[in-house]
Every structure is written in structure tokens, then in C-alpha cells.
A protein has these predicted regions:
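Bacterial Sec-dependent N-terminal signal peptides
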Residues: 1-24
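Alpha-helical structural elements
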Residues: 10-12, 40-42, 49-50, 71, ...
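Short linear sequence elements within intrinsically disordered, low-complexity coil regions
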Residues: 12, 16, 50-52, 81, ...
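Acidic, Ser/Thr/Pro-rich low-complexity intrinsically disordered segments
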Residues: 20-21, 56-174
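Non-catalytic extracellular/lumenal accessory regions of secreted precursors
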Residues: 20-64, 172-174
Length: 174
């Protein structure tokens, strides 16, 4: 009897582990496909790089920040893919990082879930120059992903349904 129960418990654990591994593999495969899709949205700009930001939805609000350098007065295009999001997030783009109190909000986008969005640095520069007179072009921008709290989330052991990612692909004008 003990051997039978041990076998059933071991089999059940193996099944749960295999299911989780399969879900994670599927999640990463979807991200790879969505990265290709985001890369296509860069045209006619040339691909420069990408950054996938992974996170788990929790019961409290979170902010993840990514810094992007802008070189040599070059125009850039940023493609954000939010098709790996089970819940919506807000993207805010600033001129300085989140530790600086007088930073300028250059662009805010909500409704990212299920979308592929494009933002150009030329538009960000126009906003920056209009809000800060006498300034030159931006040398870098900070992308903040505001992740809302989701009631009922598992903070300690999140499920695959609470896992999300935003794919950011960057390109420059040639």
C-alpha cells in the first residue's frame, strides 16, 4: 500500500513538473515569435538590439525600468510588443531615471496588452525640447513599465498565468 501511494505521489509530481516545463517552453517560444513581429515593425529602420523584460504580476504595483542610450543625433524607433501579457501594463518614457524627482514624462502608453506599438525618438525629442527650453537632443531615455497589482495573485509562488513579458526592439535610421 505504501509503495502504491509513493508511486502515485511520485507520478503526480513528475506530471506537474512536466506540465510546468511545457508551459514555460511555450511561453518562451511565443516570446521569440513576438520578437520577430516587433522587429518587422522597425522597417525602414535598421535593427539595433532588443530587451525582453520578464515579470510576475503580484498583489501590489511594481515598476521595472530599462535605460536606452541614443547615439550621435541618430533617430531611433522603438517597437513594444505586449502580446505576452495576461494583464495590461502602462509604458512611460522619461528623460531621467526613477530616482530623479524632476524628470520629464515624454510619452505614456496604456492598453499595451495584445498590441504591438511603435514610438520614435524624434517625437520624444520634440516633447523634450518643448518642455525644457534651450535643451539639445536626448542622449538617453528611461522606459518604465508600470505593472498594476492583481488581486488574488500568488506573490511567493506565481503561476504561469501571472507571468508576463514586454518585448522592446530598437532600430536606428540609416
Amino acid at each position: 500500500m505504501k509503495k502504491t501511494l509513493s508511486f502515485i505521489a511520485l507520478f503526480g509530481l513528475a506530471f506537474v513538473f512536466a506540465q510546468t516545463a511545457a508551459n514555460l517552453t511555450e511561453f518562451k517560444e511565443n516570446i521569440a515569435k513576438q520578437k520577430v513581429e516587433a522587429k518587422k515593425a522597425l522597417k525602414p529602420f535598421r535593427y539595433d538590439g532588443s530587451k525582453v523584460t520578464y515579470f510576475n504580476f503580484k498583489t501590489y504595483k511594481q515598476v521595472k525600468e530599462v535605460e536606452i542610450y541614443l547615439f550621435n543625433n541618430t533617430d531611433y524607433r522603438f517597437s513594444f510588443n505586449g502580446k505576452s501579457l495576461p494583464n495590461d501594463v502602462t509604458i512611460k518614457i522619461y528623460d531621467k531615471d526613477k530616482t530623479v524627482s524632476d524628470r520629464i514624462l515624454l510619452k505614456e502608453v496604456s492598453g499595451v496588452k495584445g498590441q504591438n506599438l511603435v514610438v520614435e525618438s524624434s517625437d520624444l525629442n520634440k516633447v523634450y525640447q518643448s518642455k525644457k527650453s534651450g535643451s539639445s537632443r536626448l542622449k538617453r531615455v528611461f522606459v518604465d513599465y508600470e505593472i498594476p497589482g492583481v488581486p488574488g495573485s500568488q506573490n511567493k509562488k506565481p503561476t504561469m498565468k501571472e507571468r508576463g513579458a514586454v518585448i522592446l526592439v530598437m532600430g536606428y535610421k540609416n
